[in-house]
Amino acid sequence: MEPMSNKQDSNSSEGDEKGWPDVPKRKRKNSQCSMKSMSALSVSVPGYIPSYLEKDEPCVVCGDKATGYHYRCITCEGCKGFFRRTIQKNLHPSYSCKYEGCCIIDKITRNQCQLCRFKKCISVGMAMDLVLDDSKRVAKRRLIEENREKRKREEMVRTLQIRPEPDTAEWELIRMATDAHRHTNAQGSSWKQKRKFLSDDIGQSPMVPTSDGDKVDLEAFSEFTKIMTPAITRVVDFAKKLPMFSELPCEDQIILLKGCCMEIMSLRAAVRYDPDSETLTLNSEMAVKREQLKNGGLGVVSDAIFDLGKELGQFNLDDTEVALMQAVLLMSSDRSGHQCMEKIEQCQEAYLLAFEHYINYRKHNIPHFWPKLLMKVTDLRMIGACHASRFLHMKVECPSELFPPLFLEVFEDQEV
């Protein structure tokens, strides 16, 4: 390399008078840029060139293709990294030049003289104070993460704030469903005080095997069937108090009731799960344990209802939410055989929207509350399907006189 005069690049700094403008017009190439702008414009994607650079704009240090503003100057990635390492590791005091500090620095010679390259960096205006040491870099990274989390929280709050709540028509729909539930839900909120526990002696009777491998305690089965008729009647009364349901043809009403009856009764039992006594309260009057319900005819369906009761405890549902779940289960358009499918779909959609908007109004603290609650509707549909299969086995194995007429009317001829 030949010694040369200390001629500076024509793009050398003329001072730090103004910050970099928001548009790509500029009078000088090395004007001061705020830390925020530099951070936003830093190159993180290989080959990415910021829009504010002119086409093939050169690095003011070596003339290679520039990639953006780095430490207050337009430079290439190589000179940016060289300058950062030099400052962070305090290497510049050890740099020396064989040619008295007069080397020309370009993209071919830049790696041959560290001192002249560093001097060129300084002379064109690269700022040493903008290079962060390890502690400052960690602090900056932490601040970036904190700001990112803060933006996420603010976005979540904004999202919650714009979630729609019920309009006037939906409030009326919600009111009618809630009233229908309260008027057909025996004992109301005082069910714990009025319930009666099924005697532990129930279950000592001879067990009758069924064709699906389970066994049935006929005494327990008899006790359960006694409360089935009033429980079914209450579900029917609930449905009839909903104007949308009453407007459907009688044939469709029957199909919907036969399909949802076990699902709604299971929901009403599940929301009255008591973790202290580990019991469900059936029809708001009889508290039963898991094994009693299982041996009394429900088999594995008993496990599903008890598990649902445990899970629903964390949701802290109020009467309105239980009522709207029942309305959604009732208005299931996928029950086969009904005539007015489109109208039933519209009814279910109306209840679903009112339900979702009411959930927004309640502002539960559980993340993703609405989709999690909808999964419980799916669980109830599965319970209904399992019970339909279980009923077929029970009807074959248990004495016909144990089945109340309304019980048979509702659960016979169901889809399995």
UniProtKB/Swiss-Prot annotation:
Residues 1-13 have a biased composition (Polar residues). Residues 1-58 are annotated as: Modulating. It comes from Paralichthys olivaceus (Bastard halibut). It is found in: Nucleus. GO terms for cellular component: RNA polymerase II transcription regulator complex. The lineage of its organism: Eukaryota, Metazoa, Chordata, Craniata, Vertebrata. The gene is thra1. Its main location: nucleus. One of its GO terms (molecular function) is nuclear receptor activity. Residues 59-126 bind DNA. CDD domains: NR_DBD_TR, NR_LBD_TR. Belongs to the nuclear hormone receptor family. NR1 subfamily. Residues 1-37 are annotated as: Disordered. A zinc finger (NR C4-type) spans 59-79, 97-121. Composed of three domains: a modulating N-terminal domain, a DNA-binding domain and a C-terminal ligand-binding domain. This is Thyroid hormone receptor alpha-A. Keywords: DNA-binding, Metal-binding, Nucleus, Receptor, Transcription, Transcription regulation, Zinc, Zinc-finger.
